[in-house]
Amino acid sequence: MSLATLETRLGHHFGDQALLEQALTHRSHGARHNERLEFLGDSVLNFVVAAMLFERYAKLDEGDLSRVRANLVKQASLADIAQRLELSPYLRLGEGEMKSGGFRRPSILADAVEALFGAVFLDAGFDAARKVIEQQYVPVLANVDPETLGKDAKTLLQEFLQGRKLALPLYTVVATHGAAHSQQFEVECAIPALEIKVTAAGASRRAAEQSAAKLALEAALVVSPRATRKGGRARKTAQLSLPVAVAQEVK
């Protein structure tokens, strides 16, 4: 496939094509691989995203800025960028890695994206790298809620209830299934003030609590979108759009 097409999607045409090829080369393919470029790109990426958040969200404190940045530069987010760039066909992998589906592996895709950022930095300097990174992240930031990104379902449910001066949810393990080494936990999440009671399962108590909290928050948003009101028990399958952070956390 033509590297020129990838360069157009990336928003940078390389003066040194060898840097682009190296950025796309996994260590399974040969000695001149992309791990050092990945290291460099990770640092440039973190700085650029930090600057973008600092300028965009003047009211966020240090802790919230760090939380949002961590979620924007994590593996899943970088793998999403790789998908938008349609990067998989351009990766240079060893035969074994190729056969095992490495071109679809999120870790390999994320590493290659960071390596590309590092390669752009070496090829044309910081301003060019910043432009490329901003081009990838501006549309992402347009759909980000900094108040919820990176917060898990239990935290969001707690904040929702506290904002309405309601008691915190009650989590109860109602059943366990399976052998000791592969147990499934079934947890109930109850919000008495809203007459909500839902259950969910998970491979650990924590995972089950997170899944139950997500269902409870969906139900609470139906029963009490802004203010508390009485009603029948909310259905555990309430269909609502929750912050993306919750959906990712409990997959």
Swiss-Prot record:
Which Gene3D superfamilies is this protein grouped with?
Answer: 3.30.160.20, Ribonuclease III domain
Catalytic residues as annotated in Swiss-Prot or TrEMBL: D42, E114
Summarize the subunit comment: Homodimer.
Task: Give the family per the record.
Answer: Belongs to the ribonuclease III family.
Give the species: Bordetella avium (strain 197N)
| Record's signal peptide | none
**Predominant subcellular localization, coarse grouping:** cytoplasm
Q: List the disulfide bonds.
A: none
What GO molecular functions are on record for this protein? double-stranded RNA binding; metal ion binding; ribonuclease III activity; rRNA binding
Q: Which PANTHER family match?
A: RIBONUCLEASE 3, RIBONUCLEASE III
Q: Could you tell me what this protein is called?
A: Ribonuclease 3
Question: What task does this protein carry out?
Answer: Digests double-stranded RNA. Involved in the processing of primary rRNA transcript to yield the immediate precursors to the large and small rRNAs (23S and 16S). Processes some mRNAs, and tRNAs when they are encoded in the rRNA operon. Processes pre-crRNA and tracrRNA of type II CRISPR loci if present in the organism.
Positions contributing to Mg(2+) binding: E38, D111, E114
All copies of the DRBM domain together span 152-222
Question: Catalysed reaction(s)?
Answer: Endonucleolytic cleavage to 5'-phosphomonoester
